[in-house]
């Protein structure tokens, strides 16, 4: 786990190809110390090149670029790129997937693809499949023994017939 974290830090600093070549742990009884040696091969430092969006019809390139917040010439950071596209660690963060899913596009998918690596620069295409708009069909309360269902329905932010919104579903769950 620590080695994975170490490599992730390298990748955040532009070293996309960083890898652990060798590792060793040696205990020295005489001085009661442990020596840990990790040999890392950094590889080349990379930078973001051109980033193009494909398949987007609902949102403009400008809107998606401002949400992505990554400019040509910045140090490559694959971890940041993934967070700006879809941050699984924070369901209500501002990222491209949430932009789509908060506006009805439940089945949208956004995939970054490296299309060209030249010298130290990586060009990307962000391939977007928007899919159809999803609407809430039915909201059902189950397992409720203490409160009248009507009270729960009143507090929900989601209603049948509304466009799907991941944010509103999460808020409803939190508030209940």
Roles of regions detected by a PLM:
Residues 1-176:
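Periplasmic polypeptide-binding modules associated with outer-membrane biogenesis and secretion
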């Amino acid at each position: 786990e620590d080695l994975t974290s170490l490599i992730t830090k390298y990748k955040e600093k532009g070293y996309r190809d960083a890898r652990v070549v060798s590792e060793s742990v040696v205990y020295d009884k005489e001085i009661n110390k442990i020596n840990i040696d990790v040999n890392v091969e950094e590889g080349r430092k990379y930078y973001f090149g051109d980033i193009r969006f494909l398949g987007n019809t609902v949102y403009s390139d400008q809107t998606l670029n401002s949400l992505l917040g990554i400019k040509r010439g910045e140090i490559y950071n694959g971890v940041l790129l993934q967070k700006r596209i879809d941050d699984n660690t924070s369901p209500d963060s501002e990222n491209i997937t949430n932009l789509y899913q908060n506006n009805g596009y439940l089945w949208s998918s956004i995939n970054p693809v490296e299309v060209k690596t030249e010298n130290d620069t990586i060009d990307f295409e962000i391939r977007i499949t928007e899919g159809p708009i999803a609407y809430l069909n039915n909201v059902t309360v189950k397992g409720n023994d203490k409160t009248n269902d009507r009270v729960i329905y009143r507090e929900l932010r989601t209603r049948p017939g509304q466009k799907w919104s991941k944010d509103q579903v999460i808020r409803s769950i939190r508030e209940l």
